[in-house]
Swiss-Prot record:
Function: One of the primary rRNA binding proteins, it binds directly to 16S rRNA where it nucleates assembly of the head domain of the 30S subunit. Is located at the subunit interface close to the decoding center, probably blocks exit of the E-site tRNA.
Coiled-coil regions, chain positions: none
Domain of life: Bacteria
CDD domains the record matches: uS7_Chloroplast
The species this protein was found in: Gloeothece citriformis (strain PCC 7424)
Name recorded for this polypeptide: Small ribosomal subunit protein uS7
rRNA-binding recorded as keyword: yes
Protein's UniProt keywords contain Chaperone: no
Keywords: Ribonucleoprotein, Ribosomal protein, RNA-binding, rRNA-binding, tRNA-binding
GO terms for cellular component: small ribosomal subunit
Record note on quaternary structure: Part of the 30S ribosomal subunit. Contacts proteins S9 and S11.
Length: 156
């Protein structure tokens, strides 16, 4: 970590098709080995599929999915006198969105199916309907925080 001043956070430009920062963040998460055009094709194909299947605006469905998958609390390990406690902490909005996108992509990759675009489309639709792996992960995170509420006074 830097001992001097905090570095400035670089602004991410919105994506050219939907003019959305969220879509660009997702493209960057899906990208592997610097292949951004492939990642953007995957995202746009997935969103097109979502639009066709739901009959709604795909960006709206995607934003709803991310909102549903965003955790409000998480647990962080805190070492106190030789013991490690799982301390529940509130999640900042930026981190919450990042976690939601990470989980959506992670559970899309682990799904069975032919193409990544199809798997991602299914995961987005499931998350928008409050089901799927990303939602299960958020619920599990909330349960962990609830179970460890007694250690909330160790917050830092």
């Amino acid at each position: 970590m830097s001992r001097r001043k905090n570095i400035k956070k670089r602004p991410i430009p919105p994506d050219p098709v939907y003019n959305s920062y969220l879509i660009n963040m997702t493209i960057r998460r899906v990208m592997r080995s610097g292949k951004k055009s492939l990642a953007s094709n995957i995202i746009y194909d997935a969103l097109k599929t979502v639009g066709e299947r739901t009959g709604r605006d795909p960006l709206e469905v995607f934003e709803q999915a991310v909102k549903n998958a965003t955790p409000l609390v998480e647990v962080k390990a805190r070492r106190v006198g030789g013991a490690t406690y799982q301390v529940p902490m509130e999640v900042r909005p930026g981190r919450g969105t990042t976690l939601a996108l990470r989980w959506l992509i992670q559970f899309s990759r682990s799904r069975s199916g032919r193409t990544m675009a199809g798997k991602l489309a299914n995961e987005i639709m499931d998350a928008a309907n409050e089901t799927g792996g990303a939602i299960k992960k958020r619920e599990e995170t909330h349960r962990m925080a609830e179970a460890n509420k007694a250690f909330a006074h160790y917050r830092y």
